[in-house]
Structures are given as C-alpha cells and as structure tokens.
Amino acid sequence: MEININCDLGEKSKFHSIENDPELLNIVNSANIACGYHAGDVDTMNMVIKISKSNGVSIGAHPSFNDPENFGRKKINLSASEITKLIVDQYEILQKIAEKHKENVTHIKPHGALNNMACEDIELANTIAKAINSVDKNIIFLVPTGSKMEIAAKKLNMKIACEIFADRNYEDDGNLVSRAKDHALITDPEIAKKHVLSMVKNQALNCFSGKLIPCEIDSVCIHGDNQSSLATAQSIKENLLSNGLILKPLNKMKKFS
C-alpha cells in the first residue's frame, strides 16, 4: 500500500524558522512551499526546491492570503476573481523558480485561513479548485480528507490527494479538535505513530472519542517546528515503513501515474 508524507516548508517569517527544513526534507516525500504571500521569499523557495530535487521530494505550491503580518491565518473575504488571481499568481511565482532548477510544481495545497475556510465553504472550495485546474489539469490538489475541497475537486475530475494530520486529534464530525482545547495536539511520538498507522491502514479517521470515520487517505501531513516534532515525524515515517507501507512522492504514486 502506498502512502505519502507531506510538510509545509520554506515558511521563513517572524512567526516561523526554517532551520529544520533541511532535516525535514530527509523525512518527507512532498514539500508544500510557501510562495511569499504569508511567508518565504525567493531565497527560501530556491533552497527548498534545490534540496527537494536532490532528495527526490516532489514540489508543491502552498498559496495563502497575502497577509504576512498574520502568517496567512486571518480570515479575509475576497471575490472569486481575487481568489483565482491569488492562487494563479503564487503558483506562477513558484513554477518560474522551479523551472530554473529544471523542476515543476506537481501539487498545490492551500495554507492557513484560506485552507480552513475552503474546508467548510463549498463556493470558496469550487473557486480554488477551478483556479488550480486552470493552471494545469494534471496538477494534484492536496486537500484535507472529507473537506468541501475534496467535493469540489471531484466535481472537476481533478487529481486529488486526501491528507490527514499526524499531530492533531479529530472530533466526531471529522473536523480537527480546536486548538483552544487541551487535547487538540498529539505531542507523544508513540501515540502519534500509532494514531497515523491506524488511520492509514483502516482508511478512516481515528476520532478522539474512538469513533472511526471511513475516508480516503493518500498523504500524512507532519510538522517539524521544533526538535520534539522532528523526532515525532521521523518516528511516524519509520513506523509506516516497518509496517509495510510504501512511501512515495505524490506525483509518483500509482494513483496519479
């Protein structure tokens, strides 16, 4: 069984360090690269693409609202044409840099508030899906499993990779437990690796209550903001491999080839 590990990278900003990015690129199969609107710059994009190419990691754009002051985490209401321009412009920024390295952007995953809003708002999800489809009909749309973006992408017969979050607990409705709650995050590496393996093997969300919600799972999103989360990410990868899972970049998975 194939599975992918992805991570948001190149997010250099006052909120986020990129010092762990080179190490993360030894763990992940696909990189979601900040395109300068919430974080990152030309130098960070070049760095992440260069290491990704060397490590066989597939390259993805991680577009956001143009809101570096809030790391793209503030909700902003824009028109459909403004959202489309937002997505297309950031894809083109990263694609032009990728081409200098003889690489291509092969997936897109929205960031922060844009992603969160589109998980619940079908009109916004439709707009994002259409924008992504307009830049390249072969591009993979990386979406949270069970989200409105998954529904929107299926309507357009897009290539869809559904992701779960390795370090987050889920509510019984399939949504992430709010960060305001004590049990939102999973910080114990042993619990995290079992949590991920169970969901991947069962193709179901493993809710905090114990409820299972059947869903499609193609990718696991990890984070590496500190040494503890780096260790958790490595533990998750090793546990997947030792249990017979085959790790692949998104664009190399049989589902998309």
Q: Where are these predicted regions, by residue range?
A:
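C-terminal domain-boundary segment and adjacent tail
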Residues: 139, 231-257
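Flexible, glycine/charged-enriched surface loops at secondary-structure junctions
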Residues: 98-106, 203-216, 246-253
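Glycine/small-residue-rich loop that forms an oxyanion/phosphate-binding "nest" at active or ligand-binding sites
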Residues: 68-107
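Active-site rim beta-loop-alpha module in soluble metabolic enzymes
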Residues: 146-204, 212-213
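Conserved, mostly hydrophobic/aromatic
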Residues: 8, 62, 108, 222
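Acidic (Asp/Glu)-rich catalytic clusters
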Residues: 22-26, 47-60, 99-101
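Glycine-rich tight-turn/loop motif centered on a GG-T
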Residues: 17, 21, 31-38, 69-84, ...
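Catalytic beta/alpha-barrel core
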Residues: 33-38, 117, 136-145
